[in-house]
Amino acid sequence: MANNHEQFIAFNDTIKASKSRRDTLKKNRESIRKKIRNYFKNNWPDKIQPQFHWQGSYSMYTLLNPIKDEDGLGAYDLDDGIYFIGSSEDERETVQWYHNQIYEAVKDHTTQGAKDNNPCVTVYFADNHHIDLPAYFMVDGDEHPKMAHKKNPWMDSDPRETTNWFNGK
């Protein structure tokens, strides 16, 4: 049997996102988290405050270098879930309320702006990466959060389960 270990390592090194790219995503994620925390603390101090959990390819250690487009750039992203954990569903706001507040918190974060999509708010960056910010509500003690999706309100969605499964936890 052929030993292709060296070829696999070389291929993996080519496709996986560089440390500098991962560091940029992490720095931008932390900056956005701080902005959202401050926004809720200053504007909605009596409401449930956001908590965060990264998800998607970054959390599964499968973030790849993007395929370049005609401008020589390639889009890549990070997904960062925003969780609102309350003692009952009576504390839950509307799907649109969560989208509006998150959008207001981040809309001027970059010169590229932000967009409110059905499943999340997206913040765009000049180097063609973006950060998706889906919102979730969960009653404390419940097993699964519900996603604030505008087309399918309060759908069951737990990306943490997928990440844990993928990472063998």
Indicate residue ranges for each PLM-predicted region.
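Generic hydrophobic/packing signal
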Residues: I82-S88, I102, V106
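N-terminal regions immediately upstream of nucleotidyltransferase
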Residues: M1-Y76, F84-W97, V123
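Intrinsically disordered, low-complexity regions
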Residues: H5-F8, N12, Y136, H144, ...
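Glycine- and aspartate-rich repeat motifs characteristic of hemolysin/RTX-like Ca2+-binding segments
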Residues: D79
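Conserved catalytic core of two-metal-ion nucleotidyltransferases
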Residues: I36-Y39, N43, Q96-M155
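Long, charge-rich alpha-helical interaction segments
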Residues: E161-K169
